[in-house]
Amino acid sequence: MLVLGSLCPAQSSVRGAETNSVQFTEPAPYTTQEEIGRRFGFAIVPPDYDLSRERFRLEVPSAQQTNLVRGLLVWLSPGDDGYFPPLWQEVLARHNLILLAPLQVGDQRHAIDRLRVALDGTCNVCRNYRVDRRRIFVGGYAGGARIASMVGIGCGDIFTGTLCICGVNFHLNVPVGGTQYYPGSFYPNPEIVQSARTKGRFVLVTGDGDPEADKMKAVADLGFRRDRFNNVTLLLVPGIAQATPEASTLEQALALLEASASTNAAPHSKYPQRQN
């Protein structure tokens, strides 16, 4: 599917949301060295990592309603500040989505650390809030989007939707003509990939001026679709290199990601529930 989006420089503020910088101490069951290897195919020894030293930006809509069931968007930035466009924050509030943005995990950080931080944060939010398992999304911009695409495929049994803006990775080589191709950058277990193929929803956002546009179009058509992923949408936003996509583009993307929420079964009960 191909959909046109648009740009807008306006900004807005969030009403009724609570924003905190938080830390967690208990790792997720799916961030062990064995699980990272199974999900992403990395054979190297991962760097030293201490979850208790990591920080996250956490924004909870209608925080005063403690028993409200919410969705979750884990947002990955190319920089260390966990930047999330202010004009999008009201969209998340309308969709009743918690925002979790890891800090200090920009493009200079080791890829395995970025994956582990995102997954540990996801698990801990699910331990502390009532999260709708049918609406657990991961997204990002540029280098953050490349990591998000890896999470969406390698953790298709956890995340139900993936939003990639101006960046994407894929697990297979993607041909671009002749002997040229975009190389696959990770190697997940085939059973994990099958879960992402059949249940995951992927929205790729690009447009004129995006240096990654050709790759994103190729990955959408000759990667995801050729590899039989069921739900992949390419959104084209004119002038995307000059401004942030407007709120209506995020609305489009979330509508596509949420389309299956009423029919998808919740993930297996091994995933953590809220601790009362």
Positions of the model-derived regions?
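Alpha/beta-hydrolase
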Residues: V74-L76, I165, V237
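Alpha/beta-hydrolase fold active-site loops
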Residues: L68-G71, L97, T160, G200-R201
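Primarily recognizes the serine-hydrolase "nucleophile elbow" in alpha/beta-hydrolase
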Residues: R134-A196
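A domain-start/cap signature at the N-terminus of enzymes
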Residues: A10-G71, G184, A220-L222, V232, ...
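The feature captures the conserved acid-bearing segment of alpha/beta-hydrolase catalytic domains
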Residues: F170-Q252, E258
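Bacterial N-terminal signal peptides
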Residues: M1-S6
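Active-site machinery of serine-nucleophile hydrolases
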Residues: R70-R127
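Gly/Ser-rich "nucleophile elbow"/oxyanion-hole loop immediately N-terminal to the catalytic nucleophile
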Residues: A63-V69, H110-G143, I153, I158
